[in-house]
Amino acid sequence: MRIAFFSAQPYEKEPFEKVNENYKHEIDYHESILNKKTAVLAEKAPVVCVFVNDKVDADTLKVLAKNGTKLIALRCAGFNNVDLKAAADNGITVVRVPAYSPYAVAEYTIGLLLSLNRKIHRAYVRVREDDFNLNGLLGHDLHGKTIGLLGTGRIGGLVAKCLKLGFGCEVLAHDIKPNKELEKFGIQFVEQQEVLAKADFLCLHCPLTPDTEHLVDEKLLASMKKGVKIINTSRGGLVDTKALVKAIESGQVGGCAMDVYEGERRLFYRDLSNEVIKDTTFQQLANFPNVLVTSHQAFFTAEALSAIAHTTLKNVSDFASQNNDPSVIVKN
């Protein structure tokens, strides 16, 4: 099938082309982010492949449907950027990659937590400038600290076990569906308020839905233990960034490490080093000394890219042969 591949990055082409040797699809790579204006690039393509920052809203879907698109193939797990009702109304099936490498994201979460706590990102910059002073780089032992987790799916579960068994942390978790297997490792499931009140570090591992958008808002931040450090490798929209900035300024939040940002569509996966970034909220956040921001790269391993390519192209082939698959979100 012909696939219009949006938000294409140079590092994606090799794994997709390698896997596609077995599937023989025709892939047209477009660097453009998908939206209602760029949707015309998918004309006569029955399949459109999108990533996290593509805007697959009702207006975009209407254009795609008019031009013959029958399948939206997400090459990611999250689908909050897709209007599922509009897809169904336009007769478009939606599939995703439910899991590619939970280890990649879990390991990166631990890396961010360690870097934030021990200020490794600041130490690296200092040494490059021949500044070997340790002032301002004091961290804390993780052993014995309380880690709070909101969400214990595949990724959250791996993070929980790593911190409990590997570092000797006390791990308190909250999930609408508690993972009983994790309790065997000494991980405690408690109410959300208890997690917030006791956590020295809070890791977010929940999906972005209408119910979880701005989950971390002014009220929630005020209810947390003073000086808490927050790590988010899930979705940027979980955090009200303006409220977070205020909480950092007041000292209520002691720092944060974020691989995602609610306004990342305008920033991430682009080289803006020679441009003026007009998002003042992001600029303010990123310039705090106790904040570490990376550009949505937690998933970014060779193994994950290969798995994403395999699942995405298999989803397309399954659609072509009308095979049912658990990757389907909206079926038409």
From Swiss-Prot:
<dbReference type="GO" id="GO:0005829">
    <property type="term" value="C:cytosol"/>
</dbReference>
<dbReference type="InterPro" id="IPR036291">
    <property type="entry name" value="NAD(P)-bd_dom_sf"/>
</dbReference>
<feature type="active site">
    <location>
        <position position="264"/>
    </location>
</feature>
<feature type="active site">
    <location>
        <position position="235"/>
    </location>
</feature>
<keyword id="KW-0520">NAD</keyword>
<feature type="binding site">
    <location>
        <position position="259"/>
    </location>
    <ligand>
        <name>NAD(+)</name>
    </ligand>
</feature>
<feature type="binding site">
    <location>
        <begin position="154"/>
        <end position="155"/>
    </location>
    <ligand>
        <name>NAD(+)</name>
    </ligand>
</feature>
<feature type="active site" description="Proton donor">
    <location>
        <position position="296"/>
    </location>
</feature>
<dbReference type="GO" id="GO:0005634">
    <property type="term" value="C:nucleus"/>
</dbReference>
<dbReference type="Pfam" id="PF02826">
    <property type="entry name" value="2-Hacid_dh_C"/>
</dbReference>
<dbReference type="GO" id="GO:0051287">
    <property type="term" value="F:NAD binding"/>
</dbReference>
<protein>
    <recommendedName>
        <fullName>2-hydroxyacid dehydrogenase homolog 1</fullName>
        <ecNumber>1.1.1.-</ecNumber>
    </recommendedName>
</protein>
<keyword id="KW-0963">Cytoplasm</keyword>
<keyword id="KW-0539">Nucleus</keyword>
<dbReference type="Pfam" id="PF00389">
    <property type="entry name" value="2-Hacid_dh"/>
</dbReference>
<dbReference type="InterPro" id="IPR029753">
    <property type="entry name" value="D-isomer_DH_CS"/>
</dbReference>
<keyword id="KW-0560">Oxidoreductase</keyword>
<dbReference type="GO" id="GO:0016616">
    <property type="term" value="F:oxidoreductase activity, acting on the CH-OH group of donors, NAD or NADP as acceptor"/>
</dbReference>
<feature type="binding site">
    <location>
        <begin position="296"/>
        <end position="299"/>
    </location>
    <ligand>
        <name>NAD(+)</name>
    </ligand>
</feature>
<dbReference type="InterPro" id="IPR006140">
    <property type="entry name" value="D-isomer_DH_NAD-bd"/>
</dbReference>
<dbReference type="InterPro" id="IPR006139">
    <property type="entry name" value="D-isomer_2_OHA_DH_cat_dom"/>
</dbReference>
<feature type="binding site">
    <location>
        <begin position="233"/>
        <end position="235"/>
    </location>
    <ligand>
        <name>NAD(+)</name>
    </ligand>
</feature>
<comment type="similarity">
    <text>Belongs to the D-isomer specific 2-hydroxyacid dehydrogenase family.</text>
</comment>
